[in-house]
């Protein structure tokens, strides 16, 4: 299943896929998958921070213009602690420490954080498996997965037939599938 970044929200798509489909999605988007993960992380961070700021403003009764009040607060500390909690949540996949307290649709954000963490772990495993192939196979497999070279070009460089290269790519893909699934 090949899903283009512009066509669908990857979080929703990834959440609904089984392990085989997730692997195919990662392989088909190997070169752009880290960027996709980062984009989903940035979007989720932005939404959570915006929602938290809206809730803070709403609780203070602000109408959009900040007015100095006598209440002691430390917005820099609040921002820093939110960033630290978001970093930890994105790394572990768990939103803890009251990160999502008072936010509407907190369960959706929690699910998004969990999926982003899973996406990152899945991709790291795939990358590690490709790296652990012998040096020559790892090199041409990365060229093929990142779409820098076609199998015909790789076969030609190695003095092999296209069919032989295609068969070897298929075997490696199956080996990768067995290790991941």
Model-derived segments and spans:
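DNA-recognition helix of helix-turn-helix
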Residues: 157-181
């Amino acid at each position: 299943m090949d899903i283009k970044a512009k066509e669908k929200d990857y979080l929703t798509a990834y959440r609904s896929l089984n392990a085989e489909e997730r692997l195919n999605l990662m392989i088909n988007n190997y070169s752009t998958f880290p960027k996709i993960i980062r984009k989903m992380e940035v979007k989720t961070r932005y939404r959570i921070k915006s929602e938290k700021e809206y809730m803070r403003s709403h609780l203070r009764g602000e109408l959009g213009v900040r007015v100095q009040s006598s209440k002691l607060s430390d917005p820099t500390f609040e921002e820093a602690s939110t960033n630290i909690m978001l970093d930890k949540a994105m790394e572990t996949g768990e939103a803890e420490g009251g990160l999502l307290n008072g936010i509407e649709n907190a369960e959706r954000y929690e699910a998004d954080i969990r999926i982003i963490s899973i996406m990152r772990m899945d991709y790291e495993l795939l990358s590690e498996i490709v790296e652990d192939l012998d040096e020559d196979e790892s090199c041409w497999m990365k060229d093929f997965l990142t779409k820098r070279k076609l199998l015909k070009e790789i076969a030609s460089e190695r003095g092999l037939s296209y069919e032989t290269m295609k068969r070897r790519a298929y075997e490696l893909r199956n080996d990768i599938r067995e290790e991941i699934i």
